[in-house]
Amino acid sequence: MSEDKAKLGTTRSATEYRLSIGSAPTSRRSSMGESSSLMKFADQEGLTSSVGEYNENTIQQLLLPKIRELSDSIITLDSNFTRLNFIHESLADLNESLGSLLYGIMSNSWCVEFSQAPHDIQDDLIAIKQLKSLEDEKNNLVMELSNMERGIKRKKDEQGENDLAKASQNKQFNQPLFPSSQVRKYRSYDNRDKRKPSKIGNNLQVENEEDYEDDTSSEASFVLNPTNIGMSKSSQGHVTKTTRLNNNTNSKLRRKSILHTIRNSIASGADLPIENDNVVNLGDLHPNNRISLGSGAARVVNGPVTKNRNSMFSGRAERKPTESRHSVAKKTEKKINTRPPFR
């Protein structure tokens, strides 16, 4: 600002002016009092001049002061505009200085608040771009690896399927084996029990656990002689060891109800030997092998009693020569008078 003032002092216009009252009369603005004094002086001189001189003096006395006043006003306006320009430049400088001050204060507060923030922004932007490029490259590599692994897995699966197909073609068909508990073996009606009777005689021997389990899980296990549990059961002499194992596995099914056991016994009556249209009891064929009194329930029918049943505490029990429970007894007609009265 001082430089501008120095320039203004050195490069002043030709017409110098001052707004103060004590300025030089040459630069003083004209006024109406001055014009009136001049008019009086002109009137005094005009008395001695002619008409032409009066007109010329009038133009000089009236127009020239006004023109001078106009020129002084224009010069004053020019100076005022110049000073206004200086004021505007000073305000612009002040604005720049104030903006710089505010920017410095904000930068200082930013550095104080965020001390960990980076200051080199250009390097940070370059590093961010490099990180993005590396991440994209990593994703591409991961995709390629996954595609390669899928291809290898597919090849292995196809190779395994081909090997299985070849093995299935070369392998012969094996008939499925069913367990003995799921297969029922049927015997013909005319089949006779051709096995030799196994007699124990007077020597009492203890059987193994399988025989004991067979005694407790037979068709008539709901009636059991507690005194003869340990002895062998010979009334079912046609039952082999394999059928005993089957009976053990199917014991739960046969224990559902007494009716099921009776139906099974009736259905298996074809295995008994038949002589002269009469069912022969296996207990009669092998009387010495009879152990349990509860191994089978027999129906009481009218007929002669050939043998007596031994006591419960005897070493062995013999079966009466009655018809087997596996067969249906022949009904004999009775007279009405022999029936018992209704109760």
Swiss-Prot record:
GO CC annotations, alphabetized = cytoplasm; DASH complex; mitotic spindle; mitotic spindle polar microtubule; mitotic spindle pole body
Query: Residue spans with biased composition (Basic and acidic residues)?
Result: 316-336
**Per UniProt, which keywords does this protein have?**
Acetylation, Cell cycle, Cell division, Centromere, Chromosome, Chromosome partition, Coiled coil, Cytoplasm, Cytoskeleton, Kinetochore, Microtubule, Mitosis, Nucleus, Phosphoprotein
Q: Compositionally biased, Polar residues: which spans? A: 167-183
Residue ranges that the Swiss-Prot or TrEMBL entry lists as coiled coil = 125-158
Any one GO molecular function term? identical protein binding
* Residues covered by region (Disordered): 1-35, 150-219, 302-343
**Which residues are reported to carry the modification N-acetylserine?**
2
Instruction: Show the ranges annotated as biased composition (Acidic residues).
Output: 207-217
InterPro entries recorded: DASH_Dam1
Q: Which GO terms describe its biological process?
A: attachment of spindle microtubules to kinetochore; cell division; centromere clustering; mitotic sister chromatid biorientation; positive regulation of attachment of spindle microtubules to kinetochore; positive regulation of microtubule polymerization; protein localization to chromosome, centromeric region; protein transport along microtubule to mitotic spindle pole body
Question: Keyword Cell division on this protein?
Answer: yes
User: Which residues get modified to Phosphoserine?
Assistant: 20, 31, 257, 265, 292
Compartment list:
Nucleus; Cytoplasm, Cytoskeleton, Spindle; Chromosome, Centromere, Kinetochore
Q: Which cysteines are joined by disulfide bonds?
A: none
Q: How does it assemble?
A: Component of the DASH complex consisting of ASK1, DAD1, DAD2, DAD3, DAD4, DAM1, DUO1, HSK3, SPC19 and SPC34, with a stoichiometry of one copy of each subunit per complex. Multiple DASH complexes oligomerize to form a ring that encircles spindle microtubules and organizes the rod-like NDC80 complexes of the outer kinetochore. DASH complex oligomerization strengthens microtubule attachments. Within the complex, DAM1 and DUO1 may form the microtubule connections. On cytoplasmic microtubules, DASH complexes appear to form patches instead of rings.
What family is reported? Belongs to the DASH complex DAM1 family.
PANTHER family (alphabetical): DASH COMPLEX SUBUNIT DAM1
Indicate what this protein is called per its UniProt record.
DASH complex subunit DAM1
Species of the source: Saccharomyces cerevisiae (strain ATCC 204508 / S288c) (Baker's yeast)
